[in-house]
Amino acid sequence: MSQTIDLTLDGLSCGHCVKRVKESLEQRPDVELADVTVTEAHVTGTASADALIETIKQAGYGATLSHPKAKPLTESSIPSEALAAVPHELPVATADEESQQLLLSGMSCASCVTRVQHALQSVPGVTQARVNLAERTALVMGSASAADLVQAVEKAGYGAEAIEDDIKRRERQQETAIATMKRFRWQAIVALAVGIPVMVWGMIGDNMMVTDDNRSLWLAIGLITLAVMVFAGGHFYRNAWKSLLNGTATMDTLVALGTGVAWLYSMSVNLWPQWFPMEARHLYYEASAMIIGLINLGHMLEARARQRSSKALEKLLDLTPPTARVVTEDGEKSVPLADVQPGMLLRLTTGDRVPVDGEITQGEAWLDEAMLTGEPIPQQKGEGDSVHAGTVVQDGSVLFRASAVGSHTTLSRIIRMVRQAQSSKPEIGQLADKISAVFVPVVVAIALFSAAIWYFFGPAPQIVYTLVIATTVLIIACPCALGLATPMSIISGVGRAAEFGVLVRDADALQRASTLDTLVFDKTGTLTEGKPQVVAIKTFNGVEEAQALRLAAALEQGSSHPLAHAILEKAGDDKLPQVNGFRTLRGLGVSGEAEGHQLLLGNQALLNEQHVATDDMTAEITAQASQGSTPVLLAIDGKAAALLAVRDPLRSDSIAALERLHNAGYRLVMLTGDNPTTANAIAKEAGIDEVIAGVLPDGKADAIKRLQSQGRQVAMVGDGINDAPALAQADVGIAMGGGSDVAIETAAITLMRHSLMGVADALAISRATLRNMKQNLLGAFIYNSIGIPVAAGILWPFTGTLLNPVVAGAAMALSSITVVSNANRLLRFKPKA
């Protein structure tokens, strides 16, 4: 029997989160209908509450059983789709959904990531935990305290430190990175300083075989190697021991087993040679030292490359000046940035970096906003214009009043979005995570199985071949490359996108954006400037142009429609008559009474509905619409009086940007409420493939659904509040930077500059990032799938050769360095114009 279960949700921040939860629930055969918003879900079907909660958790979110509450009438009248698109509080996280940032230590591979993530998610109050191997950080959403999170990580065998803000995080991360690189460097030098001479000496003269004559010398070398293993490789053994105590296995486990077994075998031969046949008295001290040295060297180079990958975010952090010039009654004074409060008056002069967001109250200046928006051309700002923290005054001097400070500035929001995106995982990375979770135990099993085959079926001396095979398999396997493949590409790709003024909400957005084939553009404010202008006025039935404009403007005083602003601007400062009985007729226009006349102002459908003859206007309506203008018709006392042609010009770069997207293979669609004739004229001018005209605001999401039902992968590009449901419905929502907060918070990708070139840049970076990610994953898979069988001796029957454990150690280190270096290529990526 069907029932409706009410759930309270955690961790949802946008329309796409809502869509993912809804799809996850409705994929269950025991669910008939799922109504989901950002805070709750109402699920109808035969599924149990526990099963539904588990499904939501598998989708990456939190859920608890709630008691149904009656909705207020005002809320229930709003479409659920629109509610789903609007988060509780746009600029900052809600109090119940705080984020904690942790700096981690002791992680070496993807198995460590899985272990830490499970530890964090098991803490009560945690709704979502993202662990980033590349940056050694964790971003935790929920109400859990920092102390509980740190304790959970330490209990799992790793180190953690709570970071309160980005400045402190950056300082500690740099300190840790520099200290780590120095430690890996001297550990590599010490290990290689011992390993290389021993290996060269053994190859030239002694052939690594123990005899009565050199036994004491080899014993001394063995003890020196042990010291190297303790001081230069101690972290491998400590981490492996912690993992063993926690019932897990990591890359450190493989290194510890491989080098430990090689040293123990060599020392056994050294101390009790009589137990081994003459041909089995081969020593592998140099292998232990060389492997530790090479892997430490690889870690050092990897850490250096990881630092480069974070430089885009560090550039954003550098944009904020340490002080600000505050203007008071006593004059100007320089104060620390932390002391600036909203409402304070501040001064900017040439060369200054803007400290906080605000509005100019006096003066004019040219501001360089390139680092914030990707727009290279300086912008002129004057009284009433907004300024944003991080931008630079190139010329001029202004006074401005602070409106947003600290974590509430646009720059802080950008940094927060970039960091969250860099910590996220795309769907393609989930395969690597699943493999990594079982990788080390499987490798150990392969090593033991291979060793057993060589022991029972291999040539003499079996014990030597068994040792070489087991050690080489353990050493060559590299879960580190698998673990780094996805996050390194994400960090580099998201950081590079930020440099072009493209903000990505999460890694999934990048992956989805790389598979798009259809781009849907809202017309007003997206393709066009969003500043309509009256370009022509035609009058009928003896009405004068001035009278028609005055009456039309009077009616539009009560309207918030963009076309109303154009008519009011055309009327200028003329004194307008009082309007009585004003009404907005949805989708048609407005009506009212002024100077004793009954007035109608709107589209042709309005006049037809009110039985106003428009035959005299038909030719002019067609002519204006064919030129891309929107005809606004005025009727006075039931007679056609005037046609006002309103045109919203295309953005200066729209045609070039659309041509670039068209050449990239996308199908371009325009979504507009205009009549088909006007819409087609604009589409022809812009180079649009398909037009969906006459769409009311609440029908945009349905239009997107229809395109998706045709099998298309759809992106919606918009900027207004009424675009929010469509942005949430699309596979990828792209919001223009000048748009509403609702649109920006709903979108998966936000463009900080008012240019469609940003759409092309965003999609190009998305494709490049996914391509880079696939290269990294494929490289890591190929390396392990070829390296492990070769290490197990698969080539022996054909070539009679085995892989040296030292070569295996070098290959392992090289695989991680290759992944990181390939990801760093994204930092130099430039979208083709």
Curated annotation (Swiss-Prot):
Which spans are transmembrane here?
186-206, 217-237, 253-273, 283-303, 437-457, 463-483, 778-798, 800-820
Kindly list the positions annotated as binding Cu(+) 2.
C109, C112
Supply the InterPro entries for this chain: ATPase_P-typ_cyto_dom_N (IPR023299), ATPase_P-typ_P_site (IPR018303), ATPase_P-typ_TM_dom_sf (IPR023298), ATPase_P-typ_transduc_dom_A_sf (IPR008250), HAD-like_sf (IPR036412), HAD_sf (IPR023214), Heavy-metal-associated_CS (IPR017969), HMA_dom (IPR006121)
Phenotype when inactivated? Causes a mild defect in aerobic growth on CuSO(4), strongly impairs survival during anaerobic growth on CuSO(4).
UniProt entry tagged with the keyword Nuclease: no
Expression induction or repression: Transcriptionally up-regulated by CueR in response to copper ions.
Kindly list the positions annotated as binding Mg(2+).
D719, D723
Catalytic residues, chain numbering: D522
Q: Kindly list the positions annotated as binding Cu(+) 1.
A: C14, C17
Q: What is its EC number?
A: 7.2.2.8
Q: Which GO terms describe its molecular function?
A: ATP binding; ATP hydrolysis activity; copper ion binding; P-type divalent copper transporter activity; P-type monovalent copper transporter activity
Q: Which reaction does it catalyse?
A: Cu(+)(in) + ATP + H2O = Cu(+)(out) + ADP + phosphate + H(+)
Which terms does the UniProt entry file under GO BP?
copper ion homeostasis; viral translational frameshifting
**A single Gene Ontology CC term:** membrane
> Ranges for the HMA domain?
3-64, 98-161
Q: Which PROSITE patterns match?
A: ATPASE_E1_E2 (PS00154), HMA_1 (PS01047), HMA_2 (PS50846)
Any one Pfam family here would be E1-E2_ATPase
Q: Which family does it belong to?
A: Belongs to the cation transport ATPase (P-type) (TC 3.A.3) family. Type IB subfamily.
Name of this chain's protein: Copper-exporting P-type ATPase
The protein's organism comes out as Salmonella typhimurium (strain LT2 / SGSC1412 / ATCC 700720)
Query: Taxonomic lineage per UniProt?
Result: Bacteria, Pseudomonadati, Pseudomonadota, Gammaproteobacteria, Enterobacterales
